[in-house]
A protein has these predicted regions:
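Structural preference for alpha-helix termini/caps and helix-kink/transition segments
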Residues: 1-165
Length: 165
């Protein structure tokens, strides 16, 4: 079975996320589409964890308490993940919060989302400047160069963020 997961491009952490999405006392039927959804959720969490290198952290103490409350309620991991899902929309984690998530869920978010190099940060700043100056050819070339390093840029109205591809 596990070799089937690997053969289909999934990792052990994708499977772990799938397991965490259900309650340990409930029976579940496995499907690759559900596993793909779990992988996407894990990707969302990784992108959330990567924000800690880009913006000031917000206070996540209430979120932490809500996650712990769910986990202390008969190990309700699905409920704990739902609390995290609500939080990722409007918050930025600290390193401490990402480490807490790794302790709670074992998803290796800190390990899989290291800070990018100073060279890449400089290229991102250069691209932002080129975009501000409306030099779209240079901006596009820099975006493509940055993408070759496995980093996707997200252009917002007031900011430019990055995430791992």
């Amino acid at each position: 079975m596990f070799s089937d997961l690997i053969a289909n491009g999934f990792s052990h952490l994708d499977y772990k996320m799938w397991v965490l999405q259900g309650h340990f006392q409930s029976e579940r039927n496995f499907s690759f589409s559900d596993l793909a959804a779990a992988r996407q959720r894990l990707t969302n969490y990784r992108n959330f964890a990567a924000l800690r290198w880009q913006k000031p952290a917000t206070d996540m103490s209430e979120v932490r308490a809500a996650i712990l409350e769910q986990l202390n309620n008969n190990l309700n991991s699905a409920g704990a993940l739902a609390e995290l899902d609500k939080a990722i929309k409007n918050n930025v984690p600290s390193n401490e919060f990402v480490e807490f998530l790794d302790e709670a869920f074992g998803l290796k978010l800190a390990e899989s989302t290291p800070d990018i190099s100073d060279e890449l940060k400089a290229k991102i700043a250069e691209r932002k400047q080129a975009k501000t100056e409306r030099d779209f050819a240079k901006s596009d070339a820099l975006r493509d160069e940055i993408a070759e390093s496995g980093i996707k840029l997200l252009d917002g109205a007031n900011e430019m963020l990055w995430q791992y591809e």
